[in-house]
UniProtKB/Swiss-Prot annotation:
F-type ATPases have 2 components, F(1) - the catalytic core - and F(0) - the membrane proton channel. F(1) has five subunits: alpha(3), beta(3), gamma(1), delta(1), epsilon(1). F(0) has three main subunits: a(1), b(2) and c(10-14). The alpha and beta chains form an alternating ring which encloses part of the gamma chain. F(1) is attached to F(0) by a central stalk formed by the gamma and epsilon chains, while a peripheral stalk is formed by the delta and b chains. It comes from the Bacteria. GO terms for cellular component: plasma membrane; proton-transporting ATP synthase complex; proton-transporting two-sector ATPase complex, proton-transporting domain. It is found in: Cell inner membrane. Its main location: membrane. The record marks E84 as: Reversibly protonated during proton transport. One of its GO terms (molecular function) is proton-transporting ATP synthase activity, rotational mechanism. F(1)F(0) ATP synthase produces ATP from ADP in the presence of a proton or sodium gradient. F-type ATPases consist of two structural domains, F(1) containing the extramembraneous catalytic core and F(0) containing the membrane proton channel, linked together by a central stalk and a peripheral stalk. During catalysis, ATP synthesis in the catalytic domain of F(1) is coupled via a rotary mechanism of the central stalk subunits to proton translocation. Key component of the F(0) channel; it plays a direct role in translocation across the membrane. A homomeric c-ring of between 10-14 subunits forms the central stalk rotor element with the F(1) delta and epsilon subunits. Coiled coil: none annotated. It comes from Helicobacter acinonychis (strain Sheeba). This is ATP synthase subunit c.
Length: 105
């Protein structure tokens, strides 16, 4: 947790370190890209943790009762697809925020 706090604190300096030649539209583009990448990173990190937990629970359940391994595997694949869908939704939102930002028109 301390590492993340230090990382984001260091990132603030990069976000505000701009040359005086930038106008407001460039700042909006910069913040859009920064927000999209941070959001996508958080979504991918959370999705990876969720997928790892789902796989671990499936392996544990199959080890305890091998007879239901097929049903657990099917349920795990459905859960993984739903977890991955959330990351893809975040990717779509990030692409929209970068390329068709309503604040830039």
């Amino acid at each position: 947790m301390k590492f993340l706090a230090l990382f984001f604190l260091a990132l603030v300096g990069v976000a505000f370190a701009y040359d005086g030649g930038m106008d407001g539209m460039d700042m909006i583009k910069s913040y859009s890209i920064l927000g999209a990448m941070i959001g996508l990173g958080i979504a991918a990190f959370g999705g990876a943790i969720g997928m790892g937990n789902a796989a671990a629970a499936t392996i544990t359940g199959t080890a305890r009762n091998p007879g239901v391994g097929g049903k657990l595997l099917t349920t795990m694949f459905v859960a993984m697809a739903m977890i991955e869908a959330q990351v893809i939704y975040t990717l779509v939102f990030a692409i929209i925020a970068i390329y068709s930002n309503p604040f830039l028109s």
